[in-house]
Amino acid sequence: MLSVPKSYTNGKMDQVVFQKQRNRLNQCFFKFKNQTKYIQFRLSEEQYNKLKISGETYGLSPNLYAKKLAQKSHLKKPYLEHDQAKSLLLELSKQGSQFKSASFRKLLDEHQLLASYSKPGYPYDNAVTEVFFKYLKQREINRRTYHSIQEVQLSCFEYIEQFYNNYNPHSANNGLTPNQKEENYFKKNIAHLTETDIVDRLLKGSPALRVGYQLYQDFLYAVKERDYVSFEELLTNNIMLPEGYQTILRTFQKFLPQIKNALQQSYSNGPLECLNNHIKVLKRNAYGFRSFYNFKLRIMIRHGNALIFN
């Protein structure tokens, strides 16, 4: 099991231990891609991106998968998520005193985490994050006064979604904005797929979705063939499905007598329900009719039974 050295005493020992720490990422953010199923990276930048709201200090902390704002106590949240996901979490930080402290190293060891430390005076590991926060503060944060963390979250969300992703080009994207780059990627890699290929890819990546999709198709086939026996078997043989599916199955169980009648009898109220739905749509749209006669006439024309009386 990989971990940082276990030395929790303060003083000169800390400096000796951390001289041996190396930059595990070395700007290769996907170097562990083939070794672990889940990889998470956290960048510790609170010491440079603090914000005071109503006398309380908050840290602006980025995540490579989702840019969110959190309080300083947010450190423990990714650790708890890491414990549940059984994934490899790399804590990328600078060699500040708060990240060399015994308590911080002890926290890493308790959750079996790795630390990757940038070299002193070497800003390139966090260059992207530094630039992002620089312009975030210049263009948005420093121009406003906030009274709650919710206001900050909304402000940053609007900046990222409405401006940064749509109007901020990057040289790394050949002068394209993030949204344009993403759109080009999907056009190049996804557009050629058929609907069947897309469904197959989705089902291949999620076993639970695959089981649920197959159950859905089985129900459709049973209804199409009017096979009540198969329909009832599907309700009793899928007790191990996730809770989301169990809700639907319980609804089917509740109305099972009515479903049985619908599958076994030759008549159906489907046409009547269809007619009522069309009437509701016509009524909702109104079509500008102000008299009941014109409204009734429009309904009859829609269904091909119009009789015009003088």
Swiss-Prot record:
PANTHER family in the record: TRANSPOSASE INSF FOR INSERTION SEQUENCE IS3B-RELATED, TRANSPOSASE INSO FOR INSERTION SEQUENCE ELEMENT IS911B-RELATED
UniProt xrefs under PROSITE patterns: INTEGRASE
Residues of the Integrase catalytic domain: 24-186
Molecular function in Gene Ontology: nucleic acid binding; peptidase activity
Swiss-Prot/TrEMBL keywords: Hydrolase, Plasmid, Protease
UniProt keyword Protease present: yes
Domain of life: Bacteria
EC number, as in UniProt: 3.4.21.-
Protein name: ATP-dependent protease
GO biological process: DNA integration; proteolysis
Source organism of this protein record: Lactococcus lactis subsp. lactis (Streptococcus lactis)
Enzyme class: hydrolase
A UniProt-annotated Pfam family: DDE_Tnp_ISL3
Record has Protease as a keyword: yes
Signal sequence range: none
